[in-house]
From Swiss-Prot:
This is Transmembrane glycoprotein NMB. Belongs to the PMEL/NMB family. Residues 23-500 are extracellular. The modification Phosphoserine is found at residue 544. The chain crosses the membrane at residues 501-521. One of its GO terms (cellular component) is melanosome membrane. Could be a melanogenic enzyme. The gene is Gpnmb. Residues 1-22 form the signal peptide. It holds the Pfam family PKD_4. Glycans are attached at residues 93, 134, 200, 249, 275, 296, 300, 306, 312, 461, 469. Residues 321-359 are annotated as: Disordered. It is found in: Cell membrane; Melanosome membrane; Early endosome membrane. GO terms for biological process: bone mineralization; cell adhesion; cell-cell signaling; negative regulation of cytokine production; negative regulation of G1/S transition of mitotic cell cycle; negative regulation of T cell activation; negative regulation of T cell proliferation; negative regulation of tumor necrosis factor production.
Amino acid sequence: MESLCGVLVFLLLAAGLPLQAAKRFRDVLGHEQYPDHMRENNQLRGWSSDENEWDEQLYPVWRRGEGRWKDSWEGGRVQAALTSDSPALVGSNITFVVNLVFPRCQKEDANGNIVYERNCRSDLELASDPYVYNWTTGADDEDWEDSTSQGQHLRFPDGKPFPRPHGRKKWNFVYVFHTLGQYFQKLGRCSARVSINTVNLTVGPQVMEVIVFRRHGRAYIPISKVKDVYVITDQIPIFVTMYQKNDRNSSDETFLRDLPIFFDVLIHDPSHFLNYSAISYKWNFGDNTGLFVSNNHTLNHTYVLNGTFNFNLTVQTAVPGPCPSPTPSPSSSTSPSPASSPSPTLSTPSPSLMPTGHKSMELSDISNENCRINRYGYFRATITIVDGILEVNIIQVADVPIPTPQPDNSLMDFIVTCKGATPTEACTIISDPTCQIAQNRVCSPVAVDELCLLSVRRAFNGSGTYCVNFTLGDDASLALTSALISIPGKDLGSPLRTVNGVLISIGCLAMFVTMVTILLYKKHKTYKPIGNCTRNVVKGKGLSVFLSHAKAPFSRGDREKDPLLQDKPWML
């Protein structure tokens, strides 16, 4: 009896060994448990159930944190970055992209091999071989063309064979995507892309997980594993940008009175699912101006009162979808309980559009699929309206005279006026004539009266044409104006000419005074007889004779001019 029990235990253990050894995709990729009805309702075209067995011999499974991950790649670890264009409207496509980030100084070349980058320093000593992994040449490359048992390793984890490569284009990475209890396997290079349709997916956040393997001889080893959350919604994903001309900060949702606000609706539709759908916009600005309905995604609105207003926008469109059951069973169309409130993401007001049982799903599958379902998108914001600076104008520009002119410096006075609130600061930006390249920026606090009249003095370096930008601001607004200013050149010779003119005038005046003095002196001079000056005459005669002898060598030609006066004494 004991031997019989031992045999039975042995048989049970032997029968259980294959079950324990055989791994499934859900054991490798994720441990989320999905109910059977979710698996049936969230079927993805081209995807397989994660209940399939995983070929652990060809694709080994490593637990997170094992030391083997460190040696899975030459020169460091490979990181995988997973992104998606979530959120996605039900019925549209959502795309996932995986990009591999190699260790420093490594990249993928045109043939799919991993090589070292040139002129890139690495912590490791680079060998003479430029390849990190050379998959183009070698014995493994011949297996792609071999259909015998030697190429049996060219298959996915579930045993399906690899697709035939086109030409010499090879893919050396295996990507396995997993979500909603299903998986999709694909070959790729350093990047892989997968798109799925969300027509049958459950609304709400979901998880996408990806594991990446690389070629390693006749097997594959994991190099990276990553997951990301994506969202499926039955609301139209929208975002509204609000802009106002003189608003200082549009992100705080505080705007100015008596200036139009520009509203622009952005619909997140990367798969262009709504391209052929008519979209209507219902605007309610909360200031008792009524409801505006338009087919344009932009609109301007001006608030004329200060205060806080609730802005509401509703976007509506009709999209293709499954038709509702024509005769829903009374047992399935139960009314909601009073304690449960409808979700704000509910886009279809009719409860018959929501599948409530397996039977209604079957009727929907066999019914005509040319129905359209209304989808809605909502945006709400609290807008605050305050007073602000509405307008700035330059009314006068004047040159400031400088006592000592400098050729490289000119001063200009600007008279600036504004409308609206009183500014607390003024900024001046001096730029080139195109108003593109700023040369000088000066900001300073200002104290302005109720008339908002401001005088600003600014210096300019050299002559030429400048673009001057004046900005007046307070806590909520920022108004500006610009003008082109021409600065004339300074005449460096004008001071010298002024000094020379003054000196010449003074010289002429001195000569005139001297001449008048001489004339007056001669006119009023007292007469003195010659006889009383005998001594002086004798002395004068001796001096005259001396001068005559001194001039004789230089003026011989003039001796005959006065022959009768030679050797004769002077007589007056």
